[in-house]
């Protein structure tokens, strides 16, 4: 469980983890209620805990207002819940994206770095170098293509080729590990971890 892993790691590092519950964007408050809460709560938390506070949200609708507030308060943002340079960053930082750069990760990573440097926020935010959902689609398609062309070991899932197709789709090394839950390891279920870049 992600939250428990975060708690355990914070305990190892001597950090305090503070949980906050925002209004559910699927509730009557809607996305605007969630975003308004974040816009009010992040500055309040920085006032209480200081600028060394790092924020993480578990819902996509939280990301844009959280990034805006982190820049304004000079605090920290670990990364979007669905790691991607395209989640929250462009609108929060006012990045204009030309039509020919809409899906260009390198362009977006550079644009984010520049905007954060202008705001004296270098080192305060990060994300994966490849968008998670695009990586899943592109890498999985490339794997299916390799399978159909006989470029795998013939099994339903050739873990080495799968890792290779994901890494190529990400433009960098992707760590792939089988999911183990309750003592059972699943051959067709994976945890993946892309390269993390701190801006």
Predicted regions and their residues:
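A residue-level marker of the well-folded mature domains of exported/periplasmic proteins
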Residues: 1-199
């Amino acid at each position: 469980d992600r939250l428990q892993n975060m708690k355990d790691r914070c305990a190892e590092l001597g950090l305090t983890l503070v949980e906050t519950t925002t209004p559910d964007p699927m509730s009557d408050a809607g996305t605007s209620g969630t975003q308004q809460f974040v816009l009010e709560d992040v500055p309040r938390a920085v006032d209480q805990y200081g600028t060394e506070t790092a924020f993480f949200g578990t819902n996509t609708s939280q990301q844009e207002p959280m990034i805006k507030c982190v820049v304004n308060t000079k605090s920290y943002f670990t990364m979007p819940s669905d790691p991607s340079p395209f989640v929250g960053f462009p609108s929060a930082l006012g990045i204009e994206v030309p039509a020919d750069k809409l899906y260009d990760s390198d362009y977006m990573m550079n644009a984010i770095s520049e905007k954060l440097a202008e705001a004296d926020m270098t080192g305060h935010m990060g994300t994966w170098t490849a968008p998670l959902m695009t990586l899943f689609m592109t890498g999985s398609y490339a794997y299916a293509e390799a399978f159909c062309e006989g470029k795998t070991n013939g099994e339903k899932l050739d873990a080495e080729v799968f890792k290779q197709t994901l890494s190529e789709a990400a433009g960098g090394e992707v760590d792939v590990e089988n999911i183990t839950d309750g003592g059972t390891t699943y051959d067709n279920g994976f945890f993946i971890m892309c390269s993390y870049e701190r801006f």
